[in-house]
Amino acid sequence: MRYTKIVCTIGPACNTEEKIAQLIDAGMNVARLNFSHGTHQDHAANIARLRRVANRLNRPIAILQDLQGPKIRTGWLQDHKPVELKDGAEFVITTRAVPGDVREVNTTYDGLPGDVKTGDRILLDDGLLELRVERVADGTDVHTRIVHGGILKEHKGINLPGVLVNTPSLTDKDREDLAFGVQQQVEYVALSFVRRAEDVALIKRALVELDPKAAKTPIIAKLEKPAALDNLDSIVDIADGVMVARGDLGVELSPQQVPIAQKRIIEAANRKRKIVITATQMLDSMIHNPIPTRAEVSDVANAIFDGTDAVMLSGETASGQYPIESVKMMASIAEEAEAHSGKYTRWEVPEEVTSDDSIALARAASELAHDREVQAIAVFTLTGRNARVLSKTRPNVPILAFTPDAKTHLRMSLMWGVIPYLVPHADSLETMLAHVEAALLLNSPVRPGQQVILIAGLPPTKLVPANFILLHTVGRS
């Protein structure tokens, strides 16, 4: 079994029912929809296809809505053709609505002239092109000198390292997209360019305003700004999970700082028992090639050794030539890394004293699984918290997570080592054990006489945290 979960971005290369089924068979656990691209009609069609295929295959596939956030981009180009920017030439970025050419391009951010000053760096297209600000004119035009030129295409990202950008954390577009996501009942929402805890609090308030029932939707904070690292602990405290978004992070920071930032973020998430996804360019060469580079393979494995819960594919599945092969490769790398994780894992389960019974029981169950030849740990949960806490202890056996809640069932597909089961509500310990045995005997190699560990909150008729642990022999009443 593979414990690390795989997030796949859905796009033109994989948005048919046939391709989605192949992604699921290859190992996809979560489908990401990137709201920087596409219309609501496009996303609604993809969601409908994902739901149909997942139901047909009887597989719990969560949907992650990734909001664009305050991304600053260049505008359109004359005749929609790329232009070549040459080193040393002057180039203007303007808020005026003009078609772009080799002399100027417009930007989606009207506040750019007010935020930058002479000497500031402007990076285009994930840092591939670099400009230096020389002056600002008329409140609309930023005159720059091209430091590192290259080919500029339409709608490319603009990064401003070291510049305090006064963009809102939740844009009008984000609010419209969030309302759409609530309507579509997505399982997770990712917020881009989180800089402080208040950014996460803002989107949580927006969810409540849209629909009080949507308040439980977990928020994944994408950490891609230096300010996010300055406020790391407070962001992780309020978010339900975090994403190591290495694309923009690697532009805002020096590239050599990104591996350290990745380890810091993963460590903080695990210490606080929050979900963490590692993303961006993990198998980037597979957009065009059927096999990855050796460096990419090592990158995926090292993220797993660092303690990530999930790894993510972006362009590899959304627009690449080898989407299915990319997922298969990601799954095989994860399985191989997990086979050696005991030797190379670089983090340890937090061992602090706790007054939380569910945390103490999760630790005890994980230690018991190491000491005895149990086949699995079964946990009953309504919200998914018990499964998530147990996942963060990194037991050496699968976690079978039983829930009567359909949304929790899907959301648990993002949790490391968790196999979700949707079952009727259990009103007694005997019913719980019956659910466990039915699942084991139907879907696993566990056989009568072997042992599993059960964690639950008793009495099951009340919503209580885990307070009960049992070492159970399968087939023995």
Q: Can you name each region flagged by the protein language model?
A:
Residues 1-477:
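Non-catalytic helical/linker scaffolds that mediate oligomerization, partner binding
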